[in-house]
A protein has these predicted regions:
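Short, structured surface patches at the beginning of a domain
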Residues: 1-147
Length: 149
């Protein structure tokens, strides 16, 4: 059971350091041994990203945990985000999103099934909401760019 971080930026104005520091700080505070943080400097429109691909295809194993700071660092396309999260879940990889506190609970350790189902439901609703917001932000930026030309 290993912990890995992932952070993505897409513009020159963004800084990889912010996300890396946030992931490291979280792990230090929680006394989690972080193996490595994978980063990409590329758009979040799709998942054709070199370091993310290595992480998902070659590194992550059953029982591992992937830590990201914000859901939109995973991607900007709602359907692709949800597809990736399902893929990771099926692969047996837990995903922790630091901006979504309910994803920080280790549900496998919960004995109360009702509480577990409630937190899973809240997680799913929050992920749907945040994935929708990430896509809306991408569409707004694309519209602005097209209006500039």
């Amino acid at each position: 059971m290993a912990y890995y971080g992932y952070h993505r930026i897409s513009t020159k104005e963004q800084h990889l350091d912010r996300g890396i520091i946030e992931i490291k700080r979280f792990c230090e505070n929680q006394k989690i041994k972080l193996e490595s943080i994978f980063t990409d400097k590329i758009t979040g429109k799709n998942f054709d990203r070199p370091r993310y691909t290595v992480l998902v295809e070659d590194v992550l194993r059953v029982g591992d945990t992937l830590i990201i700071t914000e859901l939109d660092r995973l991607g900007r396309n709602k359907q692709e985000i949800l597809k990736q999260l399902r893929f990771l879940e099926e692969k047996g990889v837990r995903v922790m999103v630091l901006e979504l506190p309910t994803t920080l609970f280790d549900l496998s350790q919960m004995e109360n099934n009702l509480a577990k189902m409630m937190i899973e439901t809240i997680n799913n609703m929050m992920i749907e909401l945040y994935a929708s917001m990430a896509q809306a932000e991408m569409e707004k930026k694309e519209k602005r760019r097209s209006e500039e030309h």
